[in-house]
UniProtKB/Swiss-Prot annotation:
EC numbers: 7.1.1.9
Gene Ontology cellular component annotations, sorted alphabetically: plasma membrane
Protein name as annotated: Cytochrome c oxidase polypeptide 2A
Cellular location(s): Cell membrane
Keyword Ribonucleoprotein: no
Transmembrane annotation, as ranges: 4-34
Enzyme category, top tier: translocase
Keyword line: Cell membrane, Electron transport, Formylation, Hydrogen ion transport, Ion transport, Membrane, Respiratory chain, Translocase, Transmembrane, Transmembrane helix, Transport
Predominant location category: membrane
Record GO terms (molecular function): cytochrome-c oxidase activity
Name of one Pfam family that matches: CoxIIa
Membrane topology, record value: Single-pass membrane protein
Reaction catalysis annotation: 4 Fe(II)-[cytochrome c] + O2 + 8 H(+)(in) = 4 Fe(III)-[cytochrome c] + 2 H2O + 4 H(+)(out)
Organism from which the protein derives: Thermus thermophilus (strain ATCC 27634 / DSM 579 / HB8)
Length: 34
């Protein structure tokens, strides 16, 4: 589990950014529809 902490951080960062972009897209569509 402690082999590559940087790799784990990178995975968490990518997941966070993906979720953030996903929710921004959902919110944009929801807002566009009124």
């Amino acid at each position: 589990m402690e082999e590559k902490p940087k790799g784990a951080l990178a995975v968490i960062l990518v997941l966070t950014l993906t979720i953030l972009v996903f929710w921004l897209g959902v919110y944009a569509v929801f807002f566009a529809r009124g």
